[in-house]
Amino acid sequence: IIGQSMGGYVGQMYSQMYPYQMRGFIAIDSAPLQRRYVTKLEIWMLKRMTSIYRYCPWQLLLKLGVDGVAISEYGRTLMHEMMMTYDGDKARYARLSGHGSRLLAEAMEADLPYEIQCPALLICGEKDRAGSAIRYNRAWHEETGIPIKWIVGAGHNSNTDAPDEVNRLIEMFIANL
């Protein structure tokens, strides 16, 4: 399973439910689901993101969303296009994004092991500014020994900021399974 950002959480949940079904796991710009990595304040905030998004002006949300996840023009353009599908319906964006954040908080609060029982790789943009992704990935790597590759000059969407490098790492990982 290869998961980027929220997709990495889905991969960890799958691993929790079916621990010996995965042959490999790659988390791209994601973070560990284990409770020990996050603070009470972070969980509290995740549970309230719907309201935060709802009361934040749309143009500010758009700027923070685009600038917060991508460094490259290509990555920023993709994020802008995705967010613009919600232009004029900020409430829908707030509900959807907030719902995902709340589910994430609940998964962390469940305090399940979320152990990866297969070969794994962490990929993270060295300029990732989404939440505390860099801190989480450092700790995840140090505690579990899962190898980590830092993508130079990439943000939270390192697969759009440096697609050739991310694809090369994925191909190498799969070739070594």
Regions found by a protein language model. Give the residues of each.
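Conserved loop-alpha-helix segment in the C-terminal half of the alpha/beta-hydrolase fold
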Residues: A120-A154, T160
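Gly/Ala-rich beta-loop-alpha elbow adjacent to hydrolase catalytic centers
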Residues: G3, G7, G11
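Flexible "cap/lid" loop of the alpha/beta hydrolase fold
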Residues: Q12-M17, R23-Y55
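Short aromatic-enriched loop/helix-cap "lid" or pocket-rim segments at secondary-structure transitions
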Residues: R36-L41, I134-Y136, D161-P163
